[in-house]
Swiss-Prot record:
Residues 256-268, 294-310 have a biased composition (Basic and acidic residues). The gene is Ccdc112. It comes from the Eukaryota. This is Coiled-coil domain-containing protein 112. Residues 23-116, 217-249, 281-400 form a coiled coil. Residues 245-272, 289-312, 392-442 are annotated as: Disordered. It is found in: Cytoplasm, Cytoskeleton, Microtubule organizing center, Centrosome, Centriolar satellite.
């Protein structure tokens, strides 16, 4: 999408240089704003994470004293307040973005409708307006039979574009909904302009004037129809009474040729009255039929209005549910991201601690090994020095005399010496071991 956008604008940059510069500047501002917001969110999350880690470290070696418990409670409240503040800020940002998205969608829809109306041309627009106006026709028979207020109301609808005042049904429905919410106060017009981006404030004011006149004429029409129905019912009752009187009068027979001209004239008058009563009855029936048709049309319009209101409420409920679901999913996603980041940070911290411990253990073993090797080398050197000194002490130059092997040793000579008696008493005999044969005579 970005590639297509840049290729399109680069191809036509000479034709739309000013517009492209404006769009490029706006895009750069939005990019910088997103980066700043991302950095701010990361900073807040990092601060919350550091506070959580600090609390975890405090909980490792803790003594259950009142001061320590109070300190831990304050830390937990601080972390909870920070998390709640972060959630509230994000919720407000999401609501603002959703409102901007709705406004943008409404603007796009309004622009699309305008473009479609431009594409259709003036002839199609006139046909559509005539189709709207044709929903409330006023024929000559109706003008002669219906009350003046009803005819005036129908003419008003025909001249102003139907029951929506020339607006489309959705715009008029939103207008009525906002107006009813504010109970007709003038402050509702600004909100209508926000909900209907395709309409200006002047158009909304003109539509409000039309709608006030529409309500006034409609109320007069209802009152007039009610009065008209009452009068017609009274006339109908009078005609029925007259008809009953006429029916009770016997019709003239052909066998009575001797009746006087005065009686025949009176009979003709009665017949004429009966015919006029029948014509009035037919006229009343036709008027009642037209009134019934009007009632049916009004009831149909009310049903359609109620159905549109119901659909609008359902749409609002669906949008509200969708919004809540989206916010909940976004909150869960952020919470999951924070949890994953915390777990990753904890794993990195644990891995770093384990790595440092292993390195320290290996370094200690290496030091012990080096010390042991040095001790062995020193011991070996010391032993070598002692041997050297010992060799220096006992070393003597002796001439070689192989015959000394056959000579008796000094010890042997001392043993073989004959020692005479030293006293007058007898000498004890001291036994000696036998001399080996190979030593005898030496």
């Amino acid at each position: 999408m970005e590639k297509d956008k840049h290729s399109h604008f680069y191809n036509q940059r000479g034709d739309f240089r000013t517009e492209y510069n404006m769009l490029e500047e706006l895009e750069n501002k939005l990019i910088n704003s997103r980066k700043t917001e991302r950095a701010k969110i990361q900073q807040q999350l990092a601060k919350i994470h550091n506070n959580v880690k600090k609390l975890q470290n405090q909980l490792k070696d803790v003594k259950p004293t009142p001061d320590v418990v109070e300190k831990l409670r304050e830390m937990m409240e601080e972390i909870e307040n920070a998390i709640n503040t972060f959630k509230e800020e994000q919720r407000l940002i999401y609501e603002e973005l959703i409102q901007e998205e709705k406004t943008t969608n409404n603007e796009l829809s309004a622009v699309s409708r305008r473009i479609e109306s431009w594409a259709l041309g003036n002839s199609e627009t006139e046909k559509a307006f005539r189709a709207i106006s044709s929903k409330v026709p006023v024929d000559r028979v109706t003008q002669r039979t219906l009350p003046e207020q009803v005819v005036e109301f129908e003419k008003f609808l025909q001249q102003t574009g139907g029951r929506q005042g020339g607006w489309d049904a959705l715009d008029h429905q939103n207008f009525v909904k906002v107006r009813n919410k504010h109970k007709g106060k003038p402050t509702f017009m600004k909100e209508v302009v926000e909900h209907l981006p395709g309409r200006t404030l002047d158009e909304v004011q003109q539509h409000e004037k039309w709608y006030q006149k529409f309500l006034t004429l409609e109320e007069k029409k209802k009152e007039s129809i009610q009065n008209w129905k009452t009068k017609k019912q009274q006339k109908k009752e009078e005609i029925l009474k007259l008809k009953e009187k006429v029916d009770t009068v016997p019709l003239p027979s052909q066998s009575k040729a001797e009746d006087s001209p005065k009686q025949r004239e009176e009979q003709r008058k009665k017949q004429k009255l009966a015919v006029e009563a029948w014509k009035k009855r037919k006229s009343l029936e036709m008027s009642a039929k037209l009134a019934s048709q009007l009632r049916e049309e009004e009831e149909k319009e009310r049903k359609q209005q109620r159905e549109r209101q119901r659909q609008s409420k359902l749409k609002l409920l669906l949008e509200s549910y969708t919004q809540q679901r989206r916010e909940q999913e976004e909150f869960l996603r952020l919470e999951q991201e924070i949890k994953e980041k915390a777990e990753k940070a904890e794993k990195r911290k644990t891995a770093a601690d384990e790595l440092a411990r292993f390195q320290e253990r290996d370094l200690h073993k290496l030091e012990l090994k080096i010390l042991d090797r040095q001790a062995k080398e020193e011991e070996k050197a010391e032993k070598q020095r002692r041997l050297t000194k010992l060799k220096e002490k006992v070393e003597n130059n002796v001439s070689r005399d192989p015959s000394r092997l056959y000579k008796p040793t000094k010890g042997w000579e001392e043993r073989t010496k004959k020692i005479g008696p030293s006293g007058s008493g007898p000498l004890l005999h001291i036994p000696h071991r036998a001399i080996p044969t190979w030593r005898q005579g030496i």
